[in-house]
Amino acid sequence: MDDLNYATLTEALEQTVFENFDDGLYIGMMSGTSLDGMDAILCQFSNHTNSSNISNEDNTQQPMHLLATYSQDFPPRLREVLLALCQPNGINQLTPTAGEPDSELEWFGWASKAYAEFASDVVNTLLQQSNTDIESVLAIGCHGQTVRHRPQMGFSLQLVDANIIAERTGISVVSDFRRRDMAVGGQGAPLVPAFHQALFAVPDSTRILLNLGGIANIAVLPAISDDLSDFNEHSDNQPSDSVVGYDTGPANLLLDAWTALHTDKDYDAGGTWAQSGQVVEPLLNQLLEHPFFVKAYPKSTGREDFNLAWLQDELQKFDQAAADIRYSSADVQATLTELTAISASAQINIFINASSNNAVYVCGGGALNDYLMMRLQAHLPRCKVETTASLGLEPTWVEAVAFAWLARQTLMGETGNLPAVTGASKGVVLGQVCFA
């Protein structure tokens, strides 16, 4: 076969294969840095262009519509082990029972298997509750649980055994999204801004997305031209590098950890506990001295930088330097809330256009924290701060939908990273596929 015919045949084959992954059902799964549980969604994508409107109804003229959702708390032992693995030497805090591992490496293997078994149960429950046949689902996008994110060392580790999920659900699984970006010099994070651009960017204005998960990150989405607004088109030929996105600092990670330490709750619902306290300004200023806040973007962070041990160390230093200042645990929660609001709003204000109407759309679990939303609005007086619900997608499901979209990008052979966001040298197809 000559080169021309071979190339033509290959192109035709690829087009046929990738088109089969276009208008179909996908499952997205996400468990964030705060380790509060696993979210799973079932959605359908299409190639129709209208990214400013998203449907939760049966409307195939929309780029995406959400068909079903399900969320499940982690089993207590799995959560305990994952939290331990997130910290250097954290397994020393674990007391193994009969048959459990006795070394860190074995705990990694145990957690990867247990996480996948739990994820499989979550998927099967989602399918059962939505009365969905597995044959209609093209793939699962499963992020896994980040236990180490070391971009300065060139690696990021997400625990999940995709083989188990594929076997137990009968659906192909795309996972390990971050390391391909890191292989071309990127931070491996944040990845969600690429999805934000695909779904939320509009031709006539700039939009800013703020994701408040365990870590906060922003995506600044410039107006897109009509000829480039197709939901399917996301490649090296698009001007996607004009998107800016990066982590801004801690969010729910510290808020939840401090709440769990001092109350009988896992999180500060609505921010009511924080609102009952007073911000300790000298402590806030000390926390803002963390070197991450002055780093230039692209940048990413995680539990390695911001964790309960770091906070307790900072409190100890503060107590030694300011012994005359008295504060309560609620005051610390108020201060941590202000830390998130200030660090995020400071970065958002860089991109605010004083002559235009500006809107910031918030997603992630932090969008449900009314007090945090109030503090963000206070620090962003030139913006209207609202959640992505006003764009048609509830804030708690955005990240799970994003990984369904990333799985689709992988199967279609399309890039999933934004080099200007992650610092990668080029756009690449992300993830590894485990076929059912």
UniProtKB/Swiss-Prot annotation:
Enzyme nomenclature, EC number: 2.7.1.170
One of the GO BP terms on file: peptidoglycan turnover
Pathway(s) where this gene product acts: Amino-sugar metabolism; 1,6-anhydro-N-acetylmuramate degradation; Cell wall biogenesis; peptidoglycan recycling
First-tier enzyme category under EC: transferase
Key words of the record: ATP-binding, Carbohydrate metabolism, Kinase, Nucleotide-binding, Transferase
UniProt KW Transferase keyword: yes
Single GO term (MF): ATP binding
Catalysed conversion reaction: 1,6-anhydro-N-acetyl-beta-muramate + ATP + H2O = N-acetyl-D-muramate 6-phosphate + ADP + H(+)
Positions contributing to ATP binding: 32-39
Nucleotide-binding found in the keyword field: yes
Function text: Catalyzes the specific phosphorylation of 1,6-anhydro-N-acetylmuramic acid (anhMurNAc) with the simultaneous cleavage of the 1,6-anhydro ring, generating MurNAc-6-P. Is required for the utilization of anhMurNAc either imported from the medium or derived from its own cell wall murein, and thus plays a role in cell wall recycling.
Family assignment from sequence similarity: Belongs to the anhydro-N-acetylmuramic acid kinase family.
NCBIfam families: PRK09585.1-3
PANTHER family cross-referenced by the UniProt entry: ANHYDRO-N-ACETYLMURAMIC ACID KINASE
Protein name as annotated: Anhydro-N-acetylmuramic acid kinase
The species this protein was found in: Psychrobacter arcticus (strain DSM 17307 / VKM B-2377 / 273-4)
Organism placement in taxonomy: Bacteria, Pseudomonadati, Pseudomonadota, Gammaproteobacteria, Moraxellales
Gene: anmK
